[in-house]
Amino acid sequence: MKYEKLRQAVYEANVGIVKAGLVVLTWGNASGVDRTAEDGGEGGVMGIKPSGVEYEKLTPADIVIVSLATGKVVDGAGRPSSDTPTHWHLYRSFPSVGGVVHTHSLYATSFAQAQRDLPCLGTTHADHFYGTVPVTRAMTAEEIATEYELNTGKVIVETFREKKIDAAQIPAVLVASHGPFAWGTDVMKAMENAIVLESVARMQLQSYQLNAGVKAIPAALLDKHYLRKHGANAYYGQKK
């Protein structure tokens, strides 16, 4: 099977987000990239779940391969996810991203629908996201009517650039009135970040219910928890 390693990883992440409870019916997708693949054109290829296929019936061979240069299918019998242009634009805009996950998970989607940012209220959030996970602006009628999925990606990138957010430090976003996207250095890390995003969104909602005036944690505590795992002198976990 061509692109076997990429297809297997993307398949496992798609199955993983279902097992993690982030997906209802077919409301979600995961993708990964191989930026070294020469036959996909400049920039390599991405693999993504086919559109509308039930997860119980999904196999690695079903994963559709798309050129990062053109956004066109280069291998695979099915149609790629309808969200493919969003994933494609994120890969093109954020070179450090190796995997993207989109779901309609309950709590993160609730914040997206409320058009609320997800500020860092505690250390669980700080261990994974270096500050507020932003919500995008609402899309215009023209953006929705023309190339909607591609414009979704463009609005995400616009949000990060205008707010000067490092996509490697905040590997997630809430698309207004839509839902969450998460990413990582590879597709399994993107899946992990999607799981964490849903968990901290649930914690946030319950924190607001207990204390409506709760504030973001102090910068010193945010720095301590994020940098001990991700900083130049990180010491969390075992040495590789």
Language model features by range: what are they?
Residues 1-240:
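Glycine-rich flexible loops
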